[in-house]
Every structure is written in structure tokens, then in C-alpha cells.
């Protein structure tokens, strides 16, 4: 991929390849997938925002047949909370599957996150995430994949 600045915005372009080892179940669509993506980001001072677009270019993807052209959009906004080490982050994404019979699997996801910078290297946070996935479609082996969740984390970046 490539990332850089074009005028007042940061741009990110690339290819993502998802490879899943092992054989597919008999008659199942390929799980491996290839996506092209483009993203733009801007820091507005009081907040920063990014928009990303992902497009599947492989025939099958993640077990969905004829998924070529499936799209995922994201919008992310980060808002520093005053002069504190806290940042509030908001995410919304929308997945639309191409292919005959794949439309019922379309969904929107969202996340709200509070991050506390402990230092230049470490941060801790909490988040809430959810989707509008349909439970009868997105339940696999008794587990609903679109279940809302609350979590906490400790992160290090260097």
C-alpha cells in the first residue's frame, strides 16, 4: 500500500489479502478474500476524522459466493476531551454483500470508545460495540456473531 499527504488530508491506499489455511467444506464458497481500500483522514484541531472504503475484488470472500464488489465503509471520529489525557472515539461501519442471496447478511456496526493515555507508550480504555445484524442469520453453532459487547483494554505502542 501507500500512505501520504495530499494537501490538507492524509491518504491511505492498499490491498488486503485474507488467507485461511485448510480446505473448505464440500460445496462451500472460498473463505480467502482480496480487498482494495482507500482512506482519507483529516485533523480539524478539535477532532480528527477518517473515512475508509473497502471493495472485494475476489470472486468469493469469507464463505460468500459471488461476493466480488462487496463493500465496507467506515467513518471514525476522535475527540480529545479538553486538556485531559482522554480521547472519545466514535466508529460506524456499513457492510454490503454482493451476490445472489447475500443481501440479508448486510449490516451496520458501531463503537464508542474512551481512551486514557497513561504515557506516550501506554493507554487504557473501555468501549461499547454493537451491530444491527439479524440474529437468525448471524448465529453460527449457537453463537450470535452480532452480540453487543463492552470491553476494556491496556495498549502499548512503540
Please state what every model-predicted region is.
Residues 1-32, 104, 141-142:
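Surface-exposed loop and membrane-interface regions of Gram-negative outer-membrane beta-barrel proteins
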Residues 2-6, 17, 40-42, 77-81, ...:
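Residue-level signature of outer-membrane beta-barrel architecture
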Residues 6-13, 44-51, 83-89, 120-126:
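Repeated loop/turn-to-beta-strand initiation elements of outer-membrane beta-barrel proteins
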Residues 9, 30-36, 67-73, 106-110, ...:
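Residues that define the transmembrane beta-barrel architecture of outer-membrane proteins
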Residues 13, 36-38, 75-77, 112, ...:
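Membrane-embedded beta-strands of outer-membrane beta-barrel proteins
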Residues 16-25, 54-63, 93-101, 109, ...:
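Sequence/structural signature of outer-membrane beta-barrel proteins
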Residues 16-73:
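Hydrophobic, well-structured mid-protein blocks that either form specific transmembrane helices
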Residues 112, 116, 143-158:
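Outer-membrane beta-barrel "beta-signal"
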Amino acid at each position: 500500500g501507500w500512505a501520504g499527504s495530499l494537501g490538507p488530508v492524509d491518504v491511505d491506499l492498499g490491498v488486503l489479502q485474507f488467507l485461511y489455511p485448510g480446505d473448505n467444506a464440500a460445496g462451500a464458497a472460498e473463505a480467502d478474500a482480496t480487498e482494495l481500500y482507500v482512506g482519507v483522514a483529516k485533523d480539524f484541531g478539535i477532532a480528527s476524522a477518517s473515512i475508509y472504503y473497502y471493495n472485494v475484488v475476489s470472486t468469493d470472500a469469507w464463505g460468500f459466493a459471488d461476493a466480488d464488489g462487496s463493500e465496507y465503509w467506515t467513518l471514525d471520529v476522535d475527540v480529545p476531551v479538553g486538556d485531559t489525557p482522554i480521547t472519545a472515539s466514535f466508529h460506524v461501519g456499513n457492510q454490503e454483500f454482493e451476490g445472489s442471496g447475500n443481501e440479508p447478511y448486510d449490516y451496520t456496526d458501531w463503537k464508542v470508545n474512551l481512551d486514557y493515555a497513561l504515557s506516550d507508550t501506554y493507554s487504557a480504555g473501555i468501549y461499547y460495540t454493537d451491530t444491527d445484524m439479524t440474529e437468525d442469520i448471524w448465529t453460527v453453532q449457537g453463537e450470535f456473531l452480532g452480540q453487543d459487547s463492552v470491553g476494556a483494554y491496556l495498549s502499548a505502542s512503540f
